[in-house]
Design a protein with these regions (language model features):
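Alpha-helical rod/repeat scaffolding segments in eukaryotic adaptors/tethers
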Residues: 7, 45, 83-87, 113-120
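Loop-to-transmembrane helix junctions at the membrane interface
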Residues: 67-99, 103
Length: 159
């Protein structure tokens, strides 16, 4: 039982680290894209609308990246034995749900898209993130069950 618990803890630490870096990479990639490639707007769009749209987009990407980092840090902490609330698993579930939707939309775009290689690479990256989020969810639930079972065995009854 202890070996299984250790393996799950290591998996949580590893996948949590992966999600943290995925969140950081998402923000860095987005920022570099804006800096080096700029943002395309319709010619009729006013400068104020362009600025507002850019700011809202930056804030949204920053929030999403922060959520990935939050889930990653929480998974690492749980893997290291710290008690974490269920909130990070709920956030992880929402991120996973939206990532699955994005993968489906990318698959549809693959049918009608022009830049097929870019779409395929993006799908692979998003699928990898979805696997990491799934692993965090599964391993966290397993670890909580093992720890709960251990507490019950130590006390002799369920609290």
């Amino acid at each position: 039982m202890s070996a299984i618990k250790n393996k799950i803890e290591i998996n949580l630490i590893t996948t949590g680290t992966g999600l943290m870096f995925f969140g950081l990479w998402t923000f860095i990639k987005f920022f570099l894209t804006i800096v080096f490639l700029g943002v395309e707007y319709d010619d009729n769009t006013s400068d104020e609308v362009k600025l507002i749209a850019t700011i809202i987009t930056i804030i949204a990407v920053a929030i999403i990246s922060a959520l990935f980092c939050y889930v990653g840090l929480s998974a690492r902490a749980e893997g290291k034995g710290k008690k974490k609330s269920v909130v990070y698993l709920i956030v992880n579930g929402f991120l996973l749900f939206f990532h699955i939707l994005i993968i489906i939309l990318e698959a549809v775009a693959l049918l009608f898209g022009e830049n097929i290689l870019t779409i395929i690479i993006t799908m692979i990256i998003d699928a990898t993130a979805a696997v990491l989020m799934s692993e965090v969810m599964i391993n966290s639930i397993k670890l909580r069950k093992i720890r709960r079972h251990k507490r019950i065995m130590e006390v002799g009854y369920e609290l």
